[in-house]
Amino acid sequence: MKNQDQALIFEVSKEGRIGYSLPKLDVEEVKLEDVFESDYIRVEDAELPEVSELDIMRHYTALSNRNHGVDSGFYPLGSCTMKYNPKINESVARFAGFANIHPLQDEKTVQGAMELMYDLQEHLIEITGMDTVTLQPAAGAHGEWTGLMLIRAYHEANGDFNRTKVIVPDSAHGTNPASATVAGFETITVKSNEHGLVDLEDLKRVVNEETAALMLTNPNTLGLFEENILEMAEIVHNAGGKLYYDGANLNAVLSQARPGDMGFDVVHLNLHKTFTGPHGGGGPGSGPVGVKADLIPYLPKPILEKTENGYHFNYDRPEAIGRVKPFYGNFGINVRAYTYIRSMGPDGLRAVTEYAVLNANYMMRRLAPFYDLPFDRHCKHEFVLSGRRQKKLGVRTLDIAKRLLDFGYHPPTIYFPLNVEECIMIEPTETESKETLDGFIDKMIQIAKEVEENPEVVQEAPHTTVIKRLDETMAARKPVLRYEKPAPVQV
């Protein structure tokens, strides 16, 4: 039996109900006034829910049953690589020698963990074609910012203080211009051509002596490989700029092509995506950054090194940009990524890309008769459709996404990239079977037919979820972020 009207945990609360008993205090009691200034001490007790352990278990178990994740269903969220995360990763991450160590331990006592991190760096160097890697950044956008700070340090060390502009394509991830801004750069947009690739003539127009870097995803966010990448690298390098690789779409080229061989100077990776660290719930992530030799002096300190005496962190880095994270990255995610890489091997990683690309092209060809296909060519790991023909019939891409919820599917990414009208971006990943793909495709075809025959069904969706249509404008402008007790009912 499912309770469709799930109470808030505060509404389950009963005064005086206790979930846990705490042990008797066995240390000296300290008054808060002796530790904190009065401004930081509550005048009244916090209004926390008073519930039993059973209440807590039932409440959060019921809520968890409403969630959708990779383990519960198909998750074709474009540009997010929502692949299945092998559970062997979790087993290894829970080894006592990994799970129970502390980052402040003496290096001599954690040599095994340091060896794993060093070996992971070596694997990532081989995969990307870079000269070295740091595991310190905590996530993708954090890696972007770190890479841009390295580029900034490089230019400033060479006296190029006028290189203040970073070029990004009009199909770029939103984090690219955001990271550039946070790193102190001005963002310049380069246009895509009619084939969905960077327009070389427009690139030549915007590149100049103020260019610090060009940020690219390859394949790009339209799922298309930038086939002119070598010429693009030459254009940027001849102008004195650096080429930055956003590793969001690395799943499309594993063991097939390497960013370093394409001419990229800096690369960030998303271990929580490509290399199966769990993601989608807000963290933690891991966004290692790889660089070519001329950027090594500026890597954040410390760097992990191997000597004849074992592994150690080198803090003697006078030109480093400093730390970008306490300690040395999100170790647990790095353990999971290392486990995945070692279990797959080079042939397995090559197969990852082959099946990811095959799945995406299969889905694209089956759906093309029912939705507009902006770029009718082979895609890589993901592809974009357009809901333009459905919009002409009064149904938006947003409606299509909400209708998919009725069938138990997480919707694809919608309205991104921004250069495709009514965009629907689908990434199936390599871990899904043909049967799963066909099930999703059949529902997308059904929705396309409903738009033509009974559009109200789609316009009013979802119909089967606990929460129906939200007032998205009010949710954005006047969000309710704190629980407030309802006013007493006057009798």
Curated annotation (Swiss-Prot):
Q: Mention any one GO cellular component term assigned to this protein in its UniProt record.
A: glycine cleavage complex
Cofactor(s) needed by this chain: pyridoxal 5'-phosphate
Q: Subunit arrangement?
A: The glycine cleavage system is composed of four proteins: P, T, L and H. In this organism, the P 'protein' is a heterodimer of two subunits.
Source organism lineage?
Answer: Bacteria, Bacillati, Bacillota, Bacilli, Bacillales
Sum up the protein's function in the record's words: The glycine cleavage system catalyzes the degradation of glycine. The P protein binds the alpha-amino group of glycine through its pyridoxal phosphate cofactor; CO(2) is released and the remaining methylamine moiety is then transferred to the lipoamide cofactor of the H protein.
Name the Pfam families on file. GcvP2_C, GDC-P
Q: Which UniProt keywords apply?
A: Oxidoreductase, Pyridoxal phosphate
Q: Which organism is it from?
A: Bacillus cereus (strain AH187)
Q: Could you tell me the EC number(s) of this protein?
A: 1.4.4.2
- Keyword check for DNA repair, yes or no: no
Q: What is this protein called?
A: Probable glycine dehydrogenase (decarboxylating) subunit 2
Q: What class of enzyme is it?
A: oxidoreductase
Which reaction is this enzyme known to catalyze? N(6)-[(R)-lipoyl]-L-lysyl-[glycine-cleavage complex H protein] + glycine + H(+) = N(6)-[(R)-S(8)-aminomethyldihydrolipoyl]-L-lysyl-[glycine-cleavage complex H protein] + CO2
